[in-house]
Amino acid sequence: MTEEKLLTKYEISKKERTEFVNKILESSGTKKVVVAGPGTGKTYLFNQILQNKKNTLTLTFVNSLVEDLSLELFGLSEVRTLHSYARSMLSKLSKKKINVFHKFSKIVQEDAKLIIDKEIDFNKLFHEREDENEHLIFYKKRRDYYNYYGYASIIFAIVKYFEKYADRIPSYDQILIDEFQDFNKLEVSLIDLLAKKSPILLVGDDDQALYEFKSANTKFIREKYNGVEPKYDSFTLPFCSRSTRVIVEAANDIIKEAKTKKLLIGRIDKPYKYFEDEEKEKECFKYPLITYSHQYDKQIPWFIDKKIKELLSLEKRSFSVLIISPLKKQSYFISTNLMSKGYQNIDYIEKDKKEFNIIDGIKLLLEDKNDVLGWRIVSKFILPEKDLIALLKTTDSNPEKKIIEILSKNHINDVKKVLSLLNYLRKKKPVDKEDFDIIIKSLKIDSLNVLKEYLLNEINSSQFKIGDPAIRKIPIKSTTIQSSKGLAADFVFITHFDNSYFIRNKDKSIISDHDICNFLVSITRTKNKLFLISSSKDEPTFLKWIKKERYEIIER
């Protein structure tokens, strides 16, 4: 009898997975790219790669992923976002303080509209490396005036620096790059420069590409994987140990149907397999099917509450829950409704607002009362538009003149009054109602909304607890599809699973690769069981792509 026959299916699966990992670890190449599907052991690989290496660097581009990786790789590697790394390097090499404001490109975009009457997407110019574009001259002029960078322009700056001074590119024992499928041309330029001096390992999955809004392109990981120069050694991690069998099979159904419909053209062909594990098999037996249900919009929180309580009866232990909705307002509605039912451990993950507001400016001025960018932001909200245009044109023609030198004394004093009151609040000093009203009015805060939030928090934190005690501490995260990247939970609820949200084209028969990736990322957050909840009576297209034996339908 052969050794293979003596091994159990679990031992065989473990042996095969180890062989895939060892191929990567034992490769002598200094440039490697690993295509790893959801839950296939990327973090374990990172840990193994970093063993016995001292000077290492791990880069990704999402703050939430940095936090998770920093914890998982604690003591093994410095983990940074690309813009954070660019800022620290530029500061170190230039020996200057580098200021970065995440909405800076939006401000310069508005300046361009008001000063030269042109709509310019500066981030796109940086992301796509349009280095010679004439509009970058205007951007640089405004950057110099405000003494700030944005996230894209700080990466652009360090790339240009390294391209000019190649001898100053730092070297590391190992560089790891996470989520490479979501990198754009600018970010890839930085990675290629760093790869000239250090061993580098890129990890990503072109089936999980979500960030096309920042000009990310799957062609970069595909070119590296398929051997386009510079030559990278290519590997895969095929075994998913996160999800139950039905989730892995459903993901494969989606990919197979997409390919049948001539979608996902150019996709890296790689296996995605359920990892045979004795403990996971118990969860597969307990949760063999995906649950699909149609619920009217306002019934969705009720349905989620009902299912969580059913799961509690079955599990008799705490477990994690992830609620994924297409829109922030849907996520917020569900979160607040669940809180009113007694759930107290809800993490409502809200993406930062893209547009800047007066509070952004006030924050900068609280740190430095002479901050030029802070005064620029505040000016937008205290001046009539014609006065703002005149002010900005003055700063453009006469950049030596600071905004605080142009504003009227009354405007300056009003802002300083607010800053003074806020500093009082910071120091927990008393502020009377009249002064507090000044703050509310100046910062354009919706006092009714603030009061509603306060009362809701007070009710939920009251000693008179509402709802079933068993549900109060269940950890729940409620978020959007894009913000779910990097997350995983025992039980996942995907809400508003309708063509109107999951297929972006007005013609719902036209499905994009991006739509497919969104759905694949959403369902593969699941460890044990997935619930798909539609708010429309029409059967969702993606549900039709999953074999019927993999899901059950629960009527309202």
Indicate residue ranges for each PLM-predicted region:
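P-loop NTPase Walker
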Residues: 1-95, 252, 323, 484, ...
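Accessory N-terminal region flanking or inserted into the helicase ATPase core
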Residues: 1-40, 44-45, 97-176, 185-190, ...
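Inter-lobe coupling/hinge region of RecA-like P-loop helicase motors
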Residues: 4-26, 30-38, 231-241, 260-324
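Conserved helicase core region in the C-terminal RecA-like lobe
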Residues: 79-88, 176, 203, 453-504, ...
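Coupling/switch/interface segments within P-loop NTPase motor domains and analogous charged loops
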Residues: 80-148, 152-153, 393-443
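Conserved RecA-like helicase ATPase core segment
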Residues: 188-286, 543-554
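ATPase/helicase motor core of nucleic-acid motors
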Residues: 227-229, 315-437
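Helicase-core coupling region on the C-terminal RecA-like lobe
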Residues: 237-304, 334, 356-361, 367-368, ...
